[in-house]
């Protein structure tokens, strides 16, 4: 007898999470809020029904907002609190807290948020407001109402442990002893002195958990998911979870995208830790001075932030700090708290690169430089840890790591630097910086430009790391032709750029930026260098056609660089030998105090040392070259400067390095690195190499410049009896004419005895063919051209030894950057 059939199991009704339009059309809904991708594409009004599951009846019912009783006072505290929550979308600072962490703040106390400019001891006492004042419709809703505390729904994410690392407050930091290391340490949450802002207005970008572009009828080649909190995630076609036409479904495969709707908090950020970190900010005058130092000493070499936008956000942030007890934080800070990481990074870079003249100003003269740098470094690293940069990167945190890397990782070994660079490349790729699809049009012009600058900056780091270690680059060569080059315009004009930029005429002098010109030159050079390195690393023999292509590319690059150099404003007619008198008396840049703000850049990159090695090999291979005098002089200057950095105490502008010794963890500064020792040995071998009698005109000064791996002997300066054959000491002209430039320097300065002999009454100095001058005040941007020359020189040596020398240039002071 067959068994009786089992009774049909009654399934519990499921909650419908799709929007009404998709349910009516019977299509899969992406369930994005506030509008799904289907409704956006079809231009439909996307509406969701709020459904709940009744635990007692097992039924699913729609939730409707409760009516307001007529007898209730519309101005009462309950109505006012609920109304303020509705106006602000129900999003409060407590949304950044994890419900299961046990550290939900009690916002019933109306103590104001900490002001970075006021000492905790002098903070005003808490004040109570009347019910009528709280419910005044014309006033900003105060965030501190116990009835408006909203806690996030349980999440599948591991909750953030609010036992966060802390740093001292600014008042405590400036009183720390010199031997105190302001390192991150474990601490407990201090809720008594910090209160959270509630009910901030949510921006449109924050309301949308995912911003994507769907294309009717055609699958998108790639996909960029933009989430609240400025988090972006690039998803390529090779990803296993990407289905053509269903791109939004792949969002849920990434932890950074799950539960990222308006109702959920940013569980990966410790809001309490970030608020406590505000106590570590310097005062407003000190921050202003450090910001100016950043734009003066760091931004010209690394223009990775949009100046006008940064200054506007900076002013809005400090305006809120002055009124934090009655105003909401700026919208950008609410939507993207990683702005604090960028702020601390900029202040730390400004303090590290600030010249001695900046520390002598009124706002900084009372501070200890070493203590200030240590404190800001600790605050920056703590902010990066609180935001979990590696797991949830944003453009702010990525730019912060690029800006601070030269100061945090000084004198690191090439292999350690390689690991750091490879991690940075992968983070940039996960954010889609290596691609520019049709989805890039949804980004703002400023974001698109900063993404390009950051990507080409990373390309330069990767190619330098590849050359230093002999390993292949971390990216594919195809990415070099996908991302557009940096826009050749000032930051003030970036907002006016079109989405599809076409070739434009050369900007007028008033519309160009010297910092951007340098960035373009470095990016173009890095593009060619990476192609050469990638080709040499593929293991195949270089064919003649490939060599011809590389040589052609190098010549095109040289033309681009010449065009950029010609746009640098100049005074006089330097190509014909007419230069300002102050430039005729100029001393080497590294011996000039005006050079001190940019010393950090030279020791971060191996580019100049690689050029020295290439030139040394060239001199050994072609001892009878007509360029030997200029090449020998360049080598002597670089080795002199590099070796003296490690052995000669620097009590002026070199103090920047001494003050940053805390970042040289594990480095022995009194010992020359092995790579530099090898170059010094090669230099000594070159000097001791015997020469034939027919090379007497090429011989450098007889007083040999003696180097040893652990000692440095300064040479003897030239005398008035020094002479030189002008037929040897000549430079290629910027034009096709046969004119030559002869430089005369009368200012006494330490120099190497291996420098070329000069006519009577002059001293040694580097030749140059382009000089720029505005005034006699000195230049703080001269180093930019020299670094560009080194890269150009390196490219010329690698590809075409017969045309070794590019045009050395100098950039001038006081031009707008």
Swiss-Prot record:
Region of interest called Disordered, as start-end residue ranges on this chain: 102-161, 180-218, 733-775
Biased composition (Low complexity): 184-195
Gene Ontology MF annotations: DNA binding; DNA-binding transcription factor activity, RNA polymerase II-specific; zinc ion binding
Knockout consequences: Leads to significant down-regulation of the yanuthone D gene clister and losses the ability to produce yanuthones D and E.
UniProt entry keywords in alphabetical sequence: DNA-binding, Metal-binding, Nucleus, Transcription, Transcription regulation, Zinc
The protein's role, per its UniProt record: Transcription factor that regulates the expression of the gene cluster that mediates the biosynthesis of yanuthone D, a fungal isoprenoid epoxycyclohexenone that acts as an antibiotic against fungi and bacteria.
Name recorded for this polypeptide: Transcription factor yanR
Organism: Aspergillus niger (strain ATCC 1015 / CBS 113.46 / FGSC A1144 / LSHB Ac4 / NCTC 3858a / NRRL 328 / USDA 3528.7)
């Amino acid at each position: 007898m067959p068994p009786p059939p089992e009774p049909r199991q009654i399934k519990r009704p499921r909650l419908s999470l799709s929007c009404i339009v998709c349910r009516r059309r019977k299509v899969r809904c992406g369930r994005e809020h506030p509008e799904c991708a289907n409704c956006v594409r079809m231009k439909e009004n996307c509406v969701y029904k709020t459904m709940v599951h009744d635990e007692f009846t097992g039924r699913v019912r729609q939730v409707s907002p409760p009516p307001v009783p007529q007898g209730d006072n519309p101005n009462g505290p309950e109505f006012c609190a609920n109304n303020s929550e509705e106006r602000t979308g129900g999003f409060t600072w407590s949304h950044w807290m994890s419900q299961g962490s046990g550290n939900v703040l009690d916002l019933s106390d109306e103590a104001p948020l900490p002001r970075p400019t006021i000492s905790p001891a002098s903070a005003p006492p808490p004040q109570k407001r009347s019910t009528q004042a709280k419910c005044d419709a014309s006033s900003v809703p105060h965030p501190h109402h116990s009835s408006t505390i909203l806690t996030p729904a349980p999440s599948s994410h591991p909750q953030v442990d609010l036992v966060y690392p802390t740093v001292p407050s600014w008042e405590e930091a400036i009183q720390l002893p010199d031997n105190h290391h302001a390192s991150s340490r474990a601490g407990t949450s201090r809720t008594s002195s910090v209160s959270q802002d509630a009910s901030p207005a949510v921006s449109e970008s924050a309301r949308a958990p995912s911003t994507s572009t769907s294309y009717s009828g055609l699958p998108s080649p790639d996909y960029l998911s933009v989430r609240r909190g400025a988090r972006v995630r690039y998803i390529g076609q090779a990803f296993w979870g990407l289905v053509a036409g269903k791109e939004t479904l792949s969002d849920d495969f990434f932890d950074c995208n799950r539960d990222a709707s308006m109702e959920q908090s940013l569980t990966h950020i410790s809001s309490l830790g970030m608020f406590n970190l505000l106590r570590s900010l310097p005062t407003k005058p000190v921050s202003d001075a450090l910001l100016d130092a950043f734009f003066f000493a760091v931004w010209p070499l690394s223009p990775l932030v949009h100046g006008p936008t940064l200054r506007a956000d900076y002013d809005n942030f400090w305006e809120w700090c002055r009124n934090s007890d009655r105003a909401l934080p700026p919208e950008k800070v609410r939507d993207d708290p990683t702005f604090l990481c960028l702020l601390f990074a900029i202040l730390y870079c400004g303090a590290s690169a600030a010249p001695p003249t900046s520390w002598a100003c009124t706002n900084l003269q009372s501070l200890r430089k070493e203590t200030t740098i240590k404190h800001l470094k600790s605050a920056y690293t703590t902010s990066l840890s609180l935001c979990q940069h590696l797991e949830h990167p944003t453009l702010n945190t990525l730019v912060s790591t690029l800006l601070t890397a030269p100061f945090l990782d000084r004198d690191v070994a090439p292999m350690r630097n390689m690991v750091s660079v490879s991690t940075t490349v992968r983070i940039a790729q996960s954010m889609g910086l290596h691609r520019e699809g049709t989805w890039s049009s949804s980004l703002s012009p400023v974001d698109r430009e900063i993404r390009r600058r950051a990507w080409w900056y990373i390309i330069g780091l990767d190619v330098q790391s590849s050359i230093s270690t002999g390993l292949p680059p971390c990216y594919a060569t195809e990415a070099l032709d996908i991302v557009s080059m940096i826009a050749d315009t000032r930051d003030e004009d970036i907002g006016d750029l079109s989405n599809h930029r076409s070739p434009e005429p050369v900007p007028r002098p008033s519309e160009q930026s010297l910092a951007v010109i340098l960035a373009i030159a470095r990016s173009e050079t890095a593009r060619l260098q990476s192609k050469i390195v990638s080709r040499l690393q593929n293991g195949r023999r270089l064919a003649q056609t490939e060599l011809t292509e590389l040589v052609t590319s190098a010549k095109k690059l040289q033309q681009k660089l010449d065009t950029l150099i010609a746009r640098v404003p100049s005074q006089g007619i330097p190509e014909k030998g007419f230069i300002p008198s102050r430039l005729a008396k100029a001393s080497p840049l590294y011996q000039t105090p005006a050079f001190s703000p940019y010393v950090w850049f030279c020791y971060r990159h191996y580019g100049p040392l690689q050029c020295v090695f290439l030139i040394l090999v060239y001199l050994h291979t072609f001892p009878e070259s007509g360029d030997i005098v200029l090449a020998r002089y360049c080598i002597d200057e670089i080795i002199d400067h590099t070796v003296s950095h490690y052995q000669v105490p620097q009590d002026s502008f070199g103090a920047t390095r001494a003050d940053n010794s805390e970042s040289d963890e594990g480095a022995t500064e009194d010992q020359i690195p092995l790579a530099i020792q090898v170059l010094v040995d090669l230099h000594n071998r070159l000097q001791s190499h015997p020469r034939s009698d027919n090379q007497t005109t090429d011989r450098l000064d007889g007083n040999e410049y003696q180097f040893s791996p652990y000692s440095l002997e300064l040479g003897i300066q030239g005398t008035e009896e020094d002479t030189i054959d002008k037929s040897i000491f000549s430079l290629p002209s910027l034009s096709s004419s046969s004119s030559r430039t002869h430089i005369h320097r009368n200012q006494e300065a330490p120099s190497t005895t291996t420098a070329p002999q000069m006519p009577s009454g002059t001293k040694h100095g580097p030749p140059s063919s382009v000089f720029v001058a505005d005034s006699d005040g000195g230049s703080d941007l001269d180093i930019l051209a020299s670094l560009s020359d080194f890269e150009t020189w390196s490219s010329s040596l690698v590809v075409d030894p017969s045309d070794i020398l590019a045009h050395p240039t100098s950039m001038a002071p006081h031009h707008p950057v």
